[in-house]
Amino acid sequence: MRKNFGAKPYTYPQPVFILASYGEDGTPDAMNAAWGGISGGSEVTMCISARHKSTENILKKKAFTISMADAAHVKECDYVGLASANDTPDKLAKAGFTV
């Protein structure tokens, strides 16, 4: 389902964004990003650390998706926020997500 939230400098309550990407070898990855929001009619802003595997993936592959976590997937979304793809390359599968 798509919903237009309009431009907002801050989002309340603070949602958990799930930023997903693929590694160079095609391995899917996802991370939680709490620092972000809708910054324009057609843009979002995400603040992520250079140390994240997702950052490396995005810079190399030039592609990613952003979704919002929902109540039905709290455990799965929490797991991708706790586990690092640098240490757990198959963390999406371990979280229970399928691609």
Cite the ranges covered by each PLM segment.
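Active-site-proximal mixed secondary-structure blocks
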Residues: 1-31, 37-99
